Amino acid sequence: MPRKGYIAKREILPDPIYKNRVLTKFINQIMLDGKKGTAESICYNAFELIQEKTGKDPIEVFETALKNVMPVLEVKARRVGGANYQVPIEVRTDRRQTLGLRWLVGYARKRSEKTMEERIAGELMDAANNTGGSIKKKEDTHKMAEANKAFAHYRW
């Protein structure tokens, strides 16, 4: 807890093409070594691939995928009397979104397609259809929370 109050969050500007703030966060998550232009081109090319393959609006596919990936519960380690317990807690809205974006990009990087555009397009389409690595991660997180439900009274 900071002694001098909380720092105001920086305002994130919407992306230049779709005018969407969440998409800007997604682009920032894709970005490596500060190369934002490269990250933007990867994202927009992936969106073009989604448009070609599904015929749907890529922003709708992206929002559906993100909604499907965002976790509701997670576990946090809590030390009680010399033992560590995995305590299930609800995830705040902003953290829910951040985790969803992080998992989408992380599991897209692990995919076997040749280019990053194809990987991101594939992961977004899979997540929109409730399949893929990022959805499995969400389900595993929920299973962990469900398994440790007995320790919910240790919540702080």
From Swiss-Prot:
Query: Which UniProt key words apply to this protein?
Result: Ribonucleoprotein, Ribosomal protein, RNA-binding, rRNA-binding, tRNA-binding
Nucleus as a keyword of this entry, yes or no, is no
Top-rank lineage group of the source organism:
Bacteria
Q: InterPro entries attached here?
A: Ribosomal_uS7, Ribosomal_uS7_bac/org-type, Ribosomal_uS7_CS, Ribosomal_uS7_dom, Ribosomal_uS7_dom_sf
Q: What are the protein's GO molecular function terms?
A: rRNA binding; structural constituent of ribosome; tRNA binding
Q: What SUPFAM superfamilies has UniProt attached to this entry?
A: Ribosomal protein S7
Stretches that traverse the bilayer: none
Cross-referenced PROSITE patterns? RIBOSOMAL_S7 (PS00052)
Can you list the GO cellular component terms from the UniProt entry?
small ribosomal subunit
Q: Name one GO biological process term.
A: translation
**Which CDD domains does this UniProt record tie to the protein?**
uS7_Bacteria
Question: Where does the signal sequence lie?
Answer: none
General function of this protein: One of the primary rRNA binding proteins, it binds directly to 16S rRNA where it nucleates assembly of the head domain of the 30S subunit. Is located at the subunit interface close to the decoding center, probably blocks exit of the E-site tRNA.
Q: Which family does it belong to?
A: Belongs to the universal ribosomal protein uS7 family.
Q: How does it assemble?
A: Part of the 30S ribosomal subunit. Contacts proteins S9 and S11.
* Protein's recorded name: Small ribosomal subunit protein uS7
